[in-house]
Regions:
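Short C-terminal domain-edge/linker segments immediately following a structured domain
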Residues: 57-58, 66-70, 132-139, 192-202, ...
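C-terminal catalytic region of ATP-dependent kinase domains
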Residues: 40, 159-306
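A general structural signal for short secondary-structure boundary/capping elements
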Residues: 71-74, 147-152, 208-215
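Conserved ATP-binding subdomain of kinase catalytic cores across diverse folds
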Residues: 2-114, 141-145, 179
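Conserved kinase catalytic-core segment
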Residues: 110, 115-177
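Short, surface-exposed linear patches
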Residues: 48-50, 57-61, 90, 123-129, ...
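Residue-level signature of transmembrane alpha-helix interfaces in integral membrane proteins
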Residues: 79, 155, 182-184
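A short, terminal or domain-edge coil/loop segment
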Residues: 18-22, 92, 120-134, 200-205
């Protein structure tokens, strides 16, 4: 039976290992496409396949951009042939389990430029920057216990589209038992959260409240049985309850706005202090000569691999 209406493909060619605690790999499947593959017996936890797949579907249901995903069949023959894809542990190599695993479509290749980190000056070129507000709202309701991850795809005109990735720490994490402060799930650089109107914030709450919950539950039934752990299902159910509670959503939005206001104040204060410090270390002779010190942002983007 198709999973979420998706026919599975099987892995055919191992490309390379990727960064990340789950030790994902990049591999080609029988449909000719490249995928970021996360094995079921990954070192992070048993809930990872559920969290990744349902997290992607939840985000898509809210109108947020995510790479498409597909169940991928890992065969024993593939594992025998590609021992480099085996996971590393303190006591040696761990053979991945065979069977259906989660695969997220790789968005790079064919001259497409992907960035994992943008310099702050480039955030204004992100077309869907407002999506980060909605993503944070969803993540708080879903008990996301890690910073929100995103990659940025650049177009020919220098603009960026953000795609949200790595949902494995939703619903209390890969084992379902973690809880964090609501700011833990924020995108790491607060400058991406540019100003939004109160009407836009209200529209985000409406999107969350109007989810087709019954359809999501029906689709979950198509997942492989070993993906549907009790703690993952419970975490997802609690997430939907929070998303449907209007007063709670309003309280969360208020906390988000206040947290971002404080974060921006701290960032501005830090930048002012750095500017004062940098000019104070220049010797009078250099300053008198009219020479200036160039400060270059070091957080330039670099190609993404997961």
């Amino acid at each position: 039976m198709p999973v979420f209406g998706k026919e599975f493909a099987f892995l055919t060619h191992y490309e390379r290992n990727l960064r990340g605690g789950s030790q994902p790999i990049l591999a080609q499947a029988s449909d000719g496409l490249l995928y970021v593959v996360k094995f079921n017996n990954n070192l992070q936890g048993a809930n990872l396949p559920f969290n990744e797949s349902i997290g992607s579907e939840l985000y898509r249901a809210c109108g947020l951009s995510c790479p498409s995903w597909k169940p991928l069949l890992v065969t024993e023959a593939f594992l025998d042939k590609n021992r480099d894809c085996w996971m590393q542990t303190p006591v040696g190599r761990l053979r991945p389990s065979s069977g259906l695993c989660f695969g997220s479509r790789f968005l790079g290749g064919d001259g497409i430029r992907l960035l994992e980190i943008l310099p702050g000056t480039s955030f204004k070129r992100v077309r869907n920057y407002q999506s980060f507000w909605l993503a944070w709202l969803i993540d708080i309701c879903a008990w996301h216990v890690d910073n929100r991850q995103a990659i940025f795809q650049e177009d020919a005109n220098g603009g960026f589209d953000a795609f949200f990735i790595d949902h494995g720490h939703l619903f209390g994490g890969p084992n379902g038992e973690l809880r964090r402060n609501f700011q833990a799930s924020r995108y790491l650089d607060p400058r991406i959260y540019q100003s939004v109107s109160s009407q836009q914030l209200q529209s985000f709450q409406k999107i969350a409240r109007c989810l087709d919950v019954d359809q999501l539950w029906q689709q979950i039934q198509t997942l492989p049985d070993d993906w549907k752990t009790a703690s993952a299902l419970d975490g997802f159910g609690q997430c939907l309850d929070r998303l449907s509670t209007s007063n709670l959503l309003q309280n969360i939005v208020d906390m988000m706005v206040e947290a971002l206001r404080q974060a921006n104040e701290r960032e501005e204060s830090k930048q002012r202090s750095e500017r004062k410090l940098s000019f104070s270390v220049l010797c009078p002779g250099i300053q008198g000569a009219g020479l200036e010190h160039n400060f270059v942002e070091n957080r330039a983007g670099y190609p993404a691999c997961a």
